[in-house]
């Protein structure tokens, strides 16, 4: 988990650069995301409450890009990304 958290900003910047994501899209969709948990190679990412309705869009547009980049930059051989809302996050 520490590797993903330590490298989170680098992961986001790499996704932006490698996949030519515009500043507007990056600041809207990716920058607000936070790593919530890493368990058994599942990286759970917390989506801000104002973006919860867009979890499906994040899954369609950015999930695979994040998975590939996380694996490349952390050395994790295989990982999955799961987006959750603040309501789904255990307190």
Residue ranges and their predicted role:
Residues 1-91:
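Intrinsically disordered, low-complexity basic tails and flexible linkers associated
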């Amino acid at each position: 988990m520490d590797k993903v958290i330590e490298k989170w900003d680098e992961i986001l910047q790499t996704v932006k650069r490698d996949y030519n994501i515009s500043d507007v899209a990056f600041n809207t969709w990716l920058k607000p995301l936070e790593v919530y948990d890493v368990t058994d190679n599942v990286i759970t990412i917390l989506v801000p409450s104002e973006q919860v309705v867009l979890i499906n869009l994040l899954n369609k547009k950015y999930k695979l890009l994040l998975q590939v980049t996380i694996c490349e930059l952390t050395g994790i051989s295989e990982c999955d990304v799961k987006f959750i809302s603040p309501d789904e996050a255990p307190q």
